[in-house]
Amino acid sequence: MARLIFVTGTSASVAEGSGTWVAISVLRDAIVALGHEVVILAPNAARTTTRSRVLFNLRIRKQLRSTRADAIIGFDLDGVFAPRGRLHVAAIKGVLADEAKHERGMERLALTIQAWLEARHVRRADRVITTSAYSAGRIASFYRLDRERIAIVPELIDLDAWDRALADAPREEGPPRILTVAHLYPRKGVDTLLRAFASVPPEAHLRIVGTGPERERLKELSHTLGIADRVHFLGHLPFIALVAEYRNATLFALPTEQEGFGIVFLEAMASSLPIVATRVAAVPEVVSDGVTALLANPGDESTLAQLLETLLNDAALRQRLGDAGRAHVARFAAPVVARQFMAAIGVT
């Protein structure tokens, strides 16, 4: 049995920590199910900042030095100051330098500072893992790391827990629903989705799950486009309510402009939903155009609107894409990916 330490400065609040905390928790549980021990070191704060993450990483150095472990796995920039002498793995879920390019203002500044630390982290680590070939290429380019040093292990989903929640979620009658789930940053392309949605049949509704700095601007845009009565900003939802949104959706859409992986696509496929997304970054590695999803080019509002309308009007196509997605998502099941992760870090 191996003993691993996971280090993450990401908030345990899904509303603040995005999908990262969920993915780390699911990975921990799946590795424990294989017979190993996993300890997570994380801050107690409900919300993290660049400053708090740096202080957290400085604060845990002594604890890491004195705690027995076969490997220290630091996620993203966290673990940057881990002591040498034991296997140190940098597990990069978001290439922060890449994300920073798509943001603005203080968010961009914060990501740029964090990216400098993430670069230092991957160069100090014994092994580097990321979730997609796209992200591996970005790490190699932005952080000047040999691409051959980077292993790829995809994100994962607990299909058993998801299926139980789906089965318990009540089915609701009503108009067609387009669902998107995202932290509301510029790079998620929700403004593009709103403009495309303005062209689809008026009986459809758009339901947006997530919070973020773009929320008020997006609300204003929905009013400007004259669709505010059909657009529902739901904020952050707890797990059971989130699954219920997937269960009652007609299709899932996220025209993102940058994505290192996209756990929400796994959630949509696990819910047998057809997907409309963009042909960009890691998205084509997760979904397959014409098989599990219909893809547009990023920023192409006209094509996006056509794809949304096509799926809204074609139940047979929705069924075909949804069924294919459900079959495809099995490759990302937690036990499967946990074994890949352990093999990648070289610990048995």
What residue ranges belong to the model's regions?
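A conserved mid-protein helix/loop that constitutes part of the nucleotide-sugar donor-binding site
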Residues: 22-26, 176, 180-199, 213-219, ...
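Conserved acidic donor-binding segment of nucleotide-sugar-dependent glycosyltransferases
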Residues: 289-290, 294-301, 310-315
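A short, well-ordered alpha-helix in the C-terminal region of glycosyltransferases
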Residues: 303, 310, 317-331
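Carbohydrate-associated surface elements
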Residues: 134, 156
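Aromatic "clamp/platform" in nucleotide-sugar-dependent glycosyltransferases that forms part
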Residues: 257
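Short alpha-helical donor nucleotide-sugar binding micro-motif in glycosyltransferases
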Residues: 236-237, 244-249
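Membrane-proximal helix-turn-helix segments that form the acceptor-binding/catalytic region
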Residues: 109-128, 137
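Short hydrophobic beta-strand element within catalytic cores of glycosyltransferases
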Residues: 274-277, 287
